Amino acid sequence: MQTTMMDVGLSLNGLLERAGRTFATQQIVSRLPDKSLRTHTYAQWHRRTRALASVLQRLGLQPGDVVATLCWNHHVHLEAYFGIPAAGGVMHTLNLRLPPGEIGAIAADAGDRFLIVDDILWPLAQQVMAQHRFERVIVFPFSGAPVPDGADDYESLLAGADPDGFSFVPHDEHAPVSMCHTSGTTGSAKGVVYSHRSTVLHALVGCMGDHWGLKNTDVLLPVAPMFHANAWGTPYGAVMCGTKLVFPGPHLHADDLLDLMQIEPPTLALGVPTIWLTMIQAYERALTEQPGRWTMPQGLRSLVGGAAVPESLIRAFDRHGVWLQQGWGMTETSPLATVSYPRVELQDAGADERYRRAAMAGVTVPLVDLRLCDDDGADVPHDGRSMGEIQVRGPFITGAYHGVGSPADKFTPDGWLRTGDVATLDDLGFLRITDRSKDLIKSGGEWISSVDLENALMSHPAVAEAAVIAIPDERWSERPLACLVLKPGAGFEPEAMREHLMAAGFAKWQCPDRYEIIDAIPRNSTGKFWKLKLRERFTR
């Protein structure tokens, strides 16, 4: 017997067309640099997106060509999410928080042809362009300022386009649609390329009730950057469901977000723990200093990821009627792989158990296979105590890296992705992250390479050896601590060291906040730095 089902490929183009037709009056709200709000309907967004695709084709974009974005969260970035693939291109989101040299290297690795950039990021773009040459640079006049000489005006290009005459580029469901870079165990950026198929499947899984639970009646506030694993895939889910979107633009300070919530109350928001920590601090401070300034949107759910969520933070928000829902994933997993949500087996559990479970990474989502393996590659028991490396596979899990392939340290012989994260699983399937086997530091949802920092520190004439470890931080989840062995007779000034690191290409936020001068760095039996001993010494 054979199936009678049609063989119709999955495509973002279908989501775009359906949204413009079915949800024509739904709103997309963007906060501009001056903090005013600009609103488009889905019908207007649909037409502008088709116009962008038409423009890109007219400029010579060929199937598979890469178009970079250097943008905050706003309607034009959403147009790029769908317009670039509609033209047959691959959208490559550039992380504007990285040093310019690193952004340029990432753009070169991807082979970016065109760049779409916010006008307020033009100074950064100029530094990036010194590292990588884009054939065309298209500036979105986000602030309304004149577009710089030598660049194309995004709005002028769209005004002269023919969205009605545009035709989608034929494609296979496995054709690439977007690309993000992630840091691997060596600290070097690696490209992950998503397909029409993987993106649609990820959005469908994400929209399930126990996960994002997106509905047409929801209002989504994506605080997580659209250059971070595509804002966790939620823009695709929002378009799929016709959800109202409220984009915060560049205004991510706690006060700004709380102000925005008074104007456009969300029912669902997402961001890294640092965002929610600073928000609850500002909110509770205002309760006594400025009573009545803000109210928390009742029933708001906040998706939190990118770093572990403290149970105390979940409790703090719950006191004000907001529930924090934790998930786990990575750029390589699109990123949603697990979500913590209420289970029927726990409906009679007390509050303490409910909070304890909420602080876990959660349960594996459908279509993702997850296993924990010990150092010998054997499965570990699901007893909530035995630890192993998380390994995953599935239709929206990457099987390789762009230009690198499938290195043995990242993929098992039987094709599973080795995440480098260490965890336990219990009998209900709840995942609890216990450690990371890699030495990367995750600060405010951003990766910092300890290896790169160590190399730069040891290039200073006063430093003989340097080892960098992550230490817990209430606000940023983790911050780098540098342990230094100085050369005989050498002095040390923290400010001078920070200037040295920034001159080497590090951003200010990537530099260590704390330095410890020690006599020697402990080593293991193979001569490698024994960072466990440093963590035991300095993180008590």
Residue ranges and their predicted role:
Residues 98, 104, 115-119, 394, ...:
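AMP-binding/adenylate-forming catalytic core of the ANL superfamily
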Residues 363-391, 427-428, 490-494, 530:
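Conserved beta-loop-beta connector loops within the AMP-binding
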Residues 15, 58-59, 86-159, 488-490:
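Structural core segment of the AMP-binding/adenylate-forming
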Residues 9, 24-26, 159-181, 188, ...:
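Conserved pre-ATP/AMP-binding loop-to-beta segment of ANL
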Residues 240, 266-271, 280-355, 369, ...:
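Gly/Ser/Thr-rich phosphate-binding loop
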Residues 39-43, 177-204, 530:
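Conserved AMP-binding A3 loop
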Residues 28-74, 78-82, 99-104, 155-156:
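Conserved AMP-binding/adenylate-forming core of the ANL superfamily
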Residues 200-219, 229-268, 282-290:
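Conserved AMP-binding/adenylation subdomain of ANL enzymes
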